[in-house]
Amino acid sequence: VLADFESKGELSRWYHANQLRQEKSIVRHGSCSARVQLSTARISGVTLLHFPHDWHGYRWLRFSVYNPLNGPLELNCRLDDSRHRRTHGPYSDRFNTQLVLRPGWNDLAIDLEEAEKAPKGRRMDMSHIAGFSLFVVQQKAPLALFLDHVRLN
């Protein structure tokens, strides 16, 4: 498990942790989730930075996101390795995908074999994953999503 939000201390492992709050009323797994407050900034989201970085041997990144809206919401997912971070590589040098969240809970899975092949001209170093980000682009109004049970398998 990369993050299950059962303790408040877990929130500090995320970049933009000030946008996160432990939540007990909307939960997918266990007794807590993370409330992710998103703004109308061009890009608004959170990034997991402090976690086991060796993902070699895992096939899936799984997590659950609750969409409180009455309609679909586009959520972007980004994975990058230490080389991308070190060289400030371009968009094409990392894994990017857009997920469409339906209202309510969405149980999502990222195929790590696809992520490994995503950087143009090279393979992502799955033994040195540097960040996992979830974000929205140019939201029209502030919005809170709920994130739970982030894990590898």
Describe the residue ranges of each PLM region.
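Beta-rich carbohydrate-recognition modules and glycan-binding surfaces
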Residues: 1-153
